[in-house]
Amino acid sequence: MYMSTSEIRTAFLEYFRSQGHQVVSSSSLVPHNDPTLLFTNAGMNQFKDVFLGADKRAYNRATTSQRCVRAGGKHNDLENVGYTARHHTFFEMLGNFSFGDYFKQDAIKFAWGFLTEVLQLPKERLLVTVYATDDEAFDIWEKEVGVPADRIVRIGDNKGAPYASDNFWAMGDTGPCGPCTEIFYDHGDHIWGGRPGSPEEDGDRFIEIWNVVFMQFNRQADGTMEPLPRPSVDTGMGLERISAIMQGVHSNYEIDIFQALIKKAAEIVGTSDLSNQSLRVIADHIRSCAFLVADGVMPSNEGRGYVLRRIIRRAVRHGRKLGATEVFFYKLAAELAAQMKDVAAELIAQLPLVERVLRIEEEQFVRTLDRGLLLLEDVLANLGDAKVIPGEVVFKLYDTYGFPADLTADVVREREIGIDEEGFKAEMEKQRARAKEASSFGVNYNEMLKLDFETPFTGYKTLTERTRVVGIYKGVDEVSGLIAGDEAVIVLEQTPFYAESGGQIGDSGTLKVDDGIFAVTDTVKAGKAIIHKGYMELGTLEKGAEVEAVVDGERRQAIALNHSVTHLLHAALRQALGEHVTQKGSLVGAERMRFDFSHFEGMTMATIRRVEELVNNQIRANHEITTQLMDLEAAKSAGAMALFGEKYEDDVRVVRMGDYSTELCGGTHAKRTGDIGFFKIIAESGIAAGVRRIEAVTGKAAIDFMHQVGEQIEEAAALVKGDQFCIADKVRQVLDKAKMMERELEQLKAKLAAQAGNDLLGQVIEIKGQKVLVAALEGADPKSLRGMLDELKNQMKSGVVLLATSGEGKVNLIAGVTNDLTGKVKAGELVNLVAQQVGGKGGGRPDMAQAGGTQPEAVPAALQSVHSWLEERL
């Protein structure tokens, strides 16, 4: 019985709905609150906390069709996609789950009922496996379901350790685990392969279609198994695999949804070979890429974004291999949305964004793709008998041409050649070391000073503190005291000075002692100690002395305003551009702030104005800015935004600005958003692929900036004899007039060139009966030379012309040959003859060529050589 992929998905969910299960929508491909996972890769991911007892749902039976990605991380099918019948980066996992409700008997009967009654698969084509010691499951299959014993296979510990088996599932080294039973479909003896557990089990005859996991134990640290108080069930069946069976095909790529994508891809790139493996790759990759972007992942050079970038670039490379000459990949997203319209509401809603992101990423990559492939072809041609591409070549392709290592591996795999992965990793480590060294400006106190001391920070509540000097260092040497003029770093018992971290620069101020002042120019961290950099401005200072630490309050306030506005800006960017925006870095100073964020294209002027408006609205709302210490998980549950890649303590500081922004942050902030006063973006630019940078000012600095802009506008208005309200029209008038004058100048030059050409005709000589003109001119530019050449050739009808002009250390040359003589004399050869003698080079067509040089003094002799050269050829 044929069923479409969509019909199978619907039938599965409706079957389990009828069995009392709650139909739960697919969760995002980006796992929430699970840092152990790169992507959602199984149906149970969204229920993990339920299985662990940390979450409780209103239902105890659930069913889903979960979108999954397996690329990068522990589960990575990327390198096999396109080369096998069943590997994918993206697939749908059909599943039914019991949270302490039914167990083995019902789970087995549900699975068998769906396969044999709803899908009507022949029972004789089905074979099952159970864990070797799971007699309960074996008996249910044989005695209650009626599967013959010879079609039930016991699988023991086949992975080298107790409970390490294809038929024993575990969430980790400890925790919930249990045996599983798997259902296989027998394609028939005309397909090579053996039963599960046999030496030929890797063949394609018996294909696993459903895995039913019985979570009944809690594995302890010592390896012992304790029964779970509420055994549960987790099942998974690949939609693509069961669709292949129901549609009577052997490869997943032959099912309806893949065939539609393959045909569309073939149409776009212009190929008729529908069996080409590259079409399989493209059809698979558009599914993972489109849904990842729809779920908020953007191409980048780290984490999930880098996996997405690798998949996109692999697809683009296969498109070029098929002959694509223009960007094509993004055009498949609409076809995918149409094919999966029943379950792709998120993709359909985000389709314009998805297409734009994929198009921009492809456009960026194709600029270097062809050059990288040429380099790789050159390396392959000179590889000889070697079967491995050197690591330094793989690194160069990555670093210079944007080739992920697995893309290079994919290219050379087609030649049965591998890559030196260890060599590549070594080159990457060298690059990281170089980057670290290059970024270490000034003194690295973390390296210099190994201080076993944690400085309490009191600066959230006060800007002055009576405290004691516990350490004075000049370089790496601890000293007992300082005199006027000494530069040093000082460690205090406790301090109100904020040390540079989280993008916020360190405080400055003074340390006052009875007979001296130490000027603090910067505050940084050395381990957990806070150190105060500066110099002894007056008097002396000794270790152990009591000092009054005074932070520069005006500077701290300016920094606080700029830090607070980064939070508002982050929220505004997510509102204006999309939830994919995340902070990539920041620099919060007293004069201005800088904010780096993930986004795939430059912001338009209208979008910049929109972001400014959103931020200034929140400033005018004058929200109270509150801080609270919370448990990390509680903070995340409360909606606090954590920065990707940042390490946080168990207790974190949560900064709230009304209902608009909630972030984890250890920096200093204003008391209310209104204190910021005014926010103005002064620059927006790209700093890396997929990363944008905004520079902005606040408060008085923003007002000063607007005054400067106003002054410049007034000055410009005066220059064009207008005012600030009509300056654009006035500038337009000036530009229009300038263009008109340029046209008149060009016309005048053309007339002068024609006149000069007529004057030059008097210098024409004959060589072997052919007209020849070789002349040096004063003050003519290259464009004028071209006009003169055309006029002279028209006047001469037949002949050879070489003109030269020089000035300011440069030489311009042009040669022309009428068509009847290009068989004897080539303009390109002639102009190069002269160019080589005047320190230059050039080229062009047989009838016209241009060149440049750097030795004006050599022009006369070079022109003299032309006559003898022509005599040999005419």
UniProtKB/Swiss-Prot annotation:
Keywords: Aminoacyl-tRNA synthetase, ATP-binding, Cytoplasm, Ligase, Metal-binding, Nucleotide-binding, Protein biosynthesis, RNA-binding, tRNA-binding, Zinc. PROSITE patterns: AA_TRNA_LIGASE_II_ALA. Its cofactor is Zn(2+). It catalyses: tRNA(Ala) + L-alanine + ATP = L-alanyl-tRNA(Ala) + AMP + diphosphate. Binds 1 zinc ion per subunit. Its main location: cytoplasm. One of its GO terms (molecular function) is aminoacyl-tRNA deacylase activity. It is found in: Cytoplasm. Zn(2+) binds at H563, H567, C665, H669. It is an enzyme of class 6 (ligase). GO terms for biological process: alanyl-tRNA aminoacylation; negative regulation of DNA-templated transcription. Disulfide bonds: none annotated. The keyword Protein biosynthesis applies. One of its GO terms (cellular component) is cytosol. Its EC number is 6.1.1.7. Consists of three domains; the N-terminal catalytic domain, the editing domain and the C-terminal C-Ala domain. The editing domain removes incorrectly charged amino acids, while the C-Ala domain, along with tRNA(Ala), serves as a bridge to cooperatively bring together the editing and aminoacylation centers thus stimulating deacylation of misacylated tRNAs. Belongs to the class-II aminoacyl-tRNA synthetase family. Catalyzes the attachment of alanine to tRNA(Ala) in a two-step reaction: alanine is first activated by ATP to form Ala-AMP and then transferred to the acceptor end of tRNA(Ala). Also edits incorrectly charged Ser-tRNA(Ala) and Gly-tRNA(Ala) via its editing domain. This is Alanine--tRNA ligase. It comes from Aeromonas hydrophila subsp. hydrophila (strain ATCC 7966 / DSM 30187 / BCRC 13018 / CCUG 14551 / JCM 1027 / KCTC 2358 / NCIMB 9240 / NCTC 8049). The lineage of its organism: Bacteria, Pseudomonadati, Pseudomonadota, Gammaproteobacteria, Aeromonadales.
